[in-house]
Structure formats: structure tokens, C-alpha cells
């Protein structure tokens, strides 16, 4: 879902 995509994007930035 969109929320999952957002969390993934934030996670990548968090790296």
C-alpha cells in the first residue's frame, strides 16, 4: 500500500 511505500522511502533515507 502507499503507506508501505512511504515507510520504505523513509527507511532508505534513514540509512
Swiss-Prot record:
Keyword annotations of the record: Amidation, Amphibian defense peptide, Antibiotic, Antimicrobial, Secreted
One Gene Ontology term from the biological process aspect of the record: defense response to Gram-positive bacterium
Organism: Crinia signifera
Protein's recorded name: Signiferin-2.1
Location within or outside the cell: Secreted
Tissue specificity: Expressed by the skin glands.
Hydrolase as UniProt keyword: no
PTM annotation (Leucine amide): residues: 15
Listed GO CC annotations: extracellular region
Stated role: Has antibacterial activity against a wide spectrum of Gram-positive bacteria including B.cereus (MIC=25 uM), E.faecalis (MIC=100 uM), L.lactis (MIC=12 uM), L.innocua (MIC=50 uM), M.luteus (MIC=25 uM), S.aureus (MIC=12 uM), S.epidermidis (MIC=25 uM) and S.uberis (MIC=25 uM). Lacks antibacterial activity against the Gram-negative bacteria E.cloacae and E.coli. Inhibits the formation of NO by neuronal nitric oxide synthase with an IC(50) of 12.4 uM.
Zinc-finger keyword on record: no
Coiled coil: none
Amino acid at each position: 500500500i502507499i503507506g508501505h511505500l512511504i515507510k520504505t522511502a523513509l527507511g532508505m533515507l534513514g540509512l
